[in-house]
Amino acid sequence: MVAMLAAGCAPARAAGPRNITLTLVRHAQSTANASGLIDTSTPGPELTPKGWCQATLAATQLAPNRYDGIYASSMIRTQETATPTAQALGEPVIVLPGLREIEAGQYEGTPEANIPQTYFAAPRRWLQGDRSARIPGSVDGNEFDARFDEAVQYIYDSGNQNPVAFSHSAAIMLWVLMNVRNPDPSLLTSKPLPNVGHVVLTGNPSEGWTLTEWDADPPPC
């Protein structure tokens, strides 16, 4: 149940700021995760059998929250992860390209074990206020933030009160820590989001967001 959306077709913005609860979920294990190599290509790798197990079990935990909108990035692994939850709730999965992973640039295909010294070198500067820092061959902090902001604005303007969006570890962690009122940058390294880990925010795009939950528990399966 994947509904593709054309760019520039966002619904009209609801009048006045209202607060919503936004849940961001990292995808389940992909074949790239299993290989230990960074893969930020689109549409990218699919889930492993273990990843499908994680997605199915995650749905049993997520579906009782009765989300009124389900979103995923343009990468296959998020759409597959969202599918069991969407089926349980009888909702379509709406694809928003802005939720995709931060492109790794020159670090594409390199070991995930080296991420703190490579892929995350520039993003750590984003969290220190230097959003002009650029991942070599990829985006800077302003470009990434604007892209993810646009996706979140679409979700907000859709009128959902309790939406869930399936995205990616770096994209979720960095956007959250760059945008909430109560950031804790140490979470990037002390509690990185595992497969099907999630965060919960309350607020709205115009007045800001508050981080209320950061679930870094080990994934099922």
Describe the residue ranges of each PLM region.
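Glycine-rich phosphate-binding loop signature in dinucleotide/nucleotide-binding domains
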Residues: P64-R66, I155-Q161
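Domain-level recognition of soluble alpha/beta enzyme cores
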Residues: P183-T210
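Short, solvent-exposed aromatic-acidic interface loops
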Residues: T212-C221
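Secretory targeting and sorting signals
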Residues: M1-A14
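Generic beta-sheet signal
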Residues: L22, Q161-S167
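Phosphate-handling substructures
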Residues: E46, Q87-R147, W214
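Active-site-proximal alpha-helix that buttresses catalytic centers in soluble enzyme cores
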Residues: G16-V95, N142
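Short beta-strand scaffold positions
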Residues: A72-S73, A146, F166-S167
